[in-house]
UniProtKB/Swiss-Prot annotation:
<keyword id="KW-0689">Ribosomal protein</keyword>
<dbReference type="InterPro" id="IPR000235">
    <property type="entry name" value="Ribosomal_uS7"/>
</dbReference>
<keyword id="KW-0694">RNA-binding</keyword>
<comment type="subunit">
    <text>Part of the 30S ribosomal subunit.</text>
</comment>
<dbReference type="InterPro" id="IPR036823">
    <property type="entry name" value="Ribosomal_uS7_dom_sf"/>
</dbReference>
<dbReference type="GO" id="GO:0019843">
    <property type="term" value="F:rRNA binding"/>
</dbReference>
<keyword id="KW-0150">Chloroplast</keyword>
<comment type="similarity">
    <text>Belongs to the universal ribosomal protein uS7 family.</text>
</comment>
<dbReference type="GO" id="GO:0003735">
    <property type="term" value="F:structural constituent of ribosome"/>
</dbReference>
<protein>
    <recommendedName>
        <fullName>Small ribosomal subunit protein uS7c</fullName>
    </recommendedName>
</protein>
<dbReference type="InterPro" id="IPR005717">
    <property type="entry name" value="Ribosomal_uS7_bac/org-type"/>
</dbReference>
<keyword id="KW-0934">Plastid</keyword>
<dbReference type="GO" id="GO:0009507">
    <property type="term" value="C:chloroplast"/>
</dbReference>
<dbReference type="InterPro" id="IPR023798">
    <property type="entry name" value="Ribosomal_uS7_dom"/>
</dbReference>
<dbReference type="GO" id="GO:0015935">
    <property type="term" value="C:small ribosomal subunit"/>
</dbReference>
<dbReference type="GO" id="GO:0006412">
    <property type="term" value="P:translation"/>
</dbReference>
<keyword id="KW-0699">rRNA-binding</keyword>
Length: 156
């Protein structure tokens, strides 16, 4: 048994411009080397570009992209008798959201082209249209979980 206490879930403050905790989560995921103002600039520039294209609330498009890129199942490793099994488990909503954000930002950074805000905009638009690399990553995780469905009876 662990002697440490379970970490309390931190409350994320709302974004000052969009009044949304989702926007704050995206900014915190973009964040590199503690440069939060740069991360905020990238996010707001991305949202402005999406607003210009679709002429509607960019947070709705972001929510749709996150919904399309968040996995419902994933595999976790479990060691039983010297053998490590990939056990499929359901993903909770918060973890699904953070995984989707991770996939979208990771795949946006891998894209070719100039300017992270442009690459992030394109990845968000692709994910909202159910295409793009982030959605492919989600489908890949689902395939892995489906392949290991035989081990789903092992409790985690």
């Amino acid at each position: 048994m662990s002697r440490r206490r379970r970490a309390k879930k931190r409350i994320i403050s709302q974004d000052p411009i969009y009044n949304s905790t989702l926007a704050s989560k995206v900014i915190n995921k973009i964040l590199l080397n503690g440069k939060k103002t740069l991360a905020q600039y990238i996010f707001y520039e991305t949202m402005k570009n999406i607003q210009e294209i679709y002429k509607k609330d960019p947070l709705d498009i972001l929510r749709k992209a996150i919904k399309n890129a968040s996995p419902q199942m994933e595999t976790r490793k479990r060691r039983i008798g010297g053998t490590i099994y990939q056990v499929p488990v359901e993903v909770k909503e918060d973890r699904g959201t953070s995984l989707a954000l991770k996939f979208i930002i990771e795949k946006a950074r891998e894209r070719k082209g100039r300017g992270i805000s442009t690459k992030l905009k394109n990845e968000i638009i692709d994910a909202s249209n159910n295409t793009g690399e982030a959605v492919k990553k989600k489908e890949e995780i689902h395939k892995t979980a489906e392949a290991n469905k035989a081990f789903s009876n092992m409790k985690f």
